[in-house]
Amino acid sequence: MKKKITRIAITGAMGRMGQVLIKEIQKNKNTVLTAALVKNNHPLIGQNIGEKIGIGKTSVSISSDINIEKNDFDVLIDFTKPSGTFYFLEQCYEFKKNMIIGTTGFSEKEIKTINSYAKKIALIKASNFSIGINLLYQLIQKTTKILGNTSDIDIIEYHHRNKIDIPSGTALSIGENISKVMNWELNKHSLYYTKGITKKIRETKKIGFSSIRSGNIIGKHTVLFSSSDEEIKITHSAFNRESFAKGAIEAAVWIHEKKHGLFNMNDILKDKF
């Protein structure tokens, strides 16, 4: 049976991630771009999105009004900021449209709200949509089961100078994966390195977080398991944003006909592999 085409709306269409998503949608035989959304008063509203991002003329004009586009898409993909994400989430909730959330930096209260919206629409929320990082989560879980009680654990993350949340959402997801295996509450077992002089030796049963913001680093995450005898280092590096975009688009296709619920990339990997 022929697979149903997924019609996708992209928010932040003229941003770095938005442009990569649109280019990858054009390459995917199972998807079509039907809405390219930007903020109000954007100077390119009304112009052809394809021409503006260098892929040739498309059938989609840049818009700031999701109400105009609401009948033209099945799934919305959002990689913006929490405030923008919630605006679009409320619209998707009202229109009964499914949504992919790639934004990070939500508060606990905002996460609870997202969970409540998933009772009516289908959502996939992930801090990182690359297949590689989601495989890293699985490796981390297995390593933690064996070494978690005998090692100091550290997460070191590197991103571009414009990333505003510290630590990264992916680093926190790694920490949550470790905490789940160890039966810890992450916020009670986190150690954030700052300037100063340590007054005591490092506490046990803590996950150390270090963040670097520099240049145009797409994303790199290293997890260390260090004991007095040896060290295991597990690293994932993203060379470009295409890996995130491809994963998000696969997520959109997967969630297209789901009725409701909150899902993550692990749900998709279970189906695919």
UniProtKB/Swiss-Prot annotation:
Annotated catalytic residues: 159 (proton donor/acceptor), 163 (proton donor)
Keyword NADP found: yes
A single GO molecular function term of this UniProt record: 4-hydroxy-tetrahydrodipicolinate reductase
Pathway the protein acts in: Amino-acid biosynthesis; L-lysine biosynthesis via DAP pathway; (S)-tetrahydrodipicolinate from L-aspartate: step 4/4
GO biological process: diaminopimelate biosynthetic process; lysine biosynthetic process via diaminopimelate
Location (main, coarse): cytoplasm
Protein localization: Cytoplasm
EC numbers: 1.17.1.8
Binding residues annotated for (S)-2,3,4,5-tetrahydrodipicolinate, in chain numbering: 160, 169-170
Catalytic activity: (S)-2,3,4,5-tetrahydrodipicolinate + NAD(+) + H2O = (2S,4S)-4-hydroxy-2,3,4,5-tetrahydrodipicolinate + NADH + H(+); (S)-2,3,4,5-tetrahydrodipicolinate + NADP(+) + H2O = (2S,4S)-4-hydroxy-2,3,4,5-tetrahydrodipicolinate + NADPH + H(+)
Any GO CC annotation of this UniProt entry: cytosol
InterPro entries: DapB_C (IPR022663), DapB_N (IPR000846), DapB_N_CS (IPR022664), DHDPR_bac (IPR023940), NAD(P)-bd_dom_sf (IPR036291)
Gene3D superfamilies: Dihydrodipicolinate Reductase, domain 2, NAD(P)-binding Rossmann-like Domain
Keyword tags: Amino-acid biosynthesis, Cytoplasm, Diaminopimelate biosynthesis, Lysine biosynthesis, NAD, NADP, Oxidoreductase
Residues where NAD(+) binds: 12-17, 102-104, 126-129
Binding residues for NADP(+): 39
Name of a matching Pfam family: DapB_N
PANTHER family for the chain: 4-HYDROXY-TETRAHYDRODIPICOLINATE REDUCTASE 1, CHLOROPLASTIC-RELATED, DIHYDRODIPICOLINATE REDUCTASE
Family: Belongs to the DapB family.
Assembly notes: Homotetramer.
Protein role: Catalyzes the conversion of 4-hydroxy-tetrahydrodipicolinate (HTPA) to tetrahydrodipicolinate.
Protein's name according to its UniProt entry: 4-hydroxy-tetrahydrodipicolinate reductase
